């Protein structure tokens, strides 16, 4: 049987963009009778060795290691994901693994933007060595591919396969009703830059709801302190982690989904909102977001609080919301994970 190892420092129940990507890709491959093992750590964002060593999740074998993975069993392909979460024993072993003279299995890597982020001279050098050693690199956007090529990675090795969107985003019944709030979905961490939205809300007649796991407790404390300093307790709510059903219901009823991250590989929550026909507002710092969202067409791209105020005022017009929502549904029809997984499997088999 064709066997794929997915290697990722963190995995579900940790829910970030990379973790959700690996789960959905693995689940679809299992449906195609591919034997998939996810190798990961037992860590969460905030606790070490918290999770059980082994489980089967939707047909996916999940093997959680105490410190790092060990190469064995000669899988058909090794697919690496996102070494950028933290420089750990896991990452060190992976870097050393790539220095081995020969490995039977083809090596594929989806960097999830880490190859285009500056992590210091030593880490950048190690990443470039990985780029030379892998057989293929998967970029999730044309922007990421162009950035990698500009940094010296071999363009002939890079294939663009965008992130998919979970079938539930397409199929879950639409929640009726409308409430006047912006919804910010993302882990609580400085690079997600929720503080920008909070600073803007003080001068806007709209509420802000935040959902997502806490990766950085200090940043959550900073957020809540700033909310208190600005007297926004009635306008800003942090709901923590919610179910997928609750997430989509919150999306459907919102004025817009907002994301003002400093950096993103693609911004899967923005794509989920587009599938639901919900308007989106994105910051211009994470350049990839403006390749998905065209200002005034299927959402708004902002760089300041005034831009956000202007976007909110435009979205108060039901005709504008309806037109943007319809544009988003039209754009997003090809984003089902099965389509994405077929492209990835085709790539694997081209290396066999």
UniProtKB/Swiss-Prot annotation:
<comment type="function">
    <text>Glycosyltransferase catalyzing the last biosynthesis step of the N-glycan biosynthesis.</text>
</comment>
<keyword id="KW-0808">Transferase</keyword>
<keyword id="KW-0328">Glycosyltransferase</keyword>
<dbReference type="Pfam" id="PF00534">
    <property type="entry name" value="Glycos_transf_1"/>
</dbReference>
<comment type="similarity">
    <text>Belongs to the glycosyltransferase group 1 family. Glycosyltransferase 4 subfamily.</text>
</comment>
<comment type="pathway">
    <text>Protein modification; protein glycosylation.</text>
</comment>
<dbReference type="GO" id="GO:0006486">
    <property type="term" value="P:protein glycosylation"/>
</dbReference>
<dbReference type="InterPro" id="IPR028098">
    <property type="entry name" value="Glyco_trans_4-like_N"/>
</dbReference>
<comment type="pathway">
    <text>Cell surface structure biogenesis; S-layer biogenesis.</text>
</comment>
<dbReference type="GO" id="GO:0016757">
    <property type="term" value="F:glycosyltransferase activity"/>
</dbReference>
<dbReference type="Pfam" id="PF13439">
    <property type="entry name" value="Glyco_transf_4"/>
</dbReference>
<protein>
    <recommendedName>
        <fullName>Archaeal glycosylation protein 16</fullName>
        <ecNumber>2.4.1.-</ecNumber>
    </recommendedName>
</protein>
<dbReference type="InterPro" id="IPR001296">
    <property type="entry name" value="Glyco_trans_1"/>
</dbReference>
<dbReference type="GO" id="GO:0045232">
    <property type="term" value="P:S-layer organization"/>
</dbReference>
<dbReference type="InterPro" id="IPR050194">
    <property type="entry name" value="Glycosyltransferase_grp1"/>
</dbReference>
<dbReference type="InterPro" id="IPR053689">
    <property type="entry name" value="AGL16-like"/>
</dbReference>
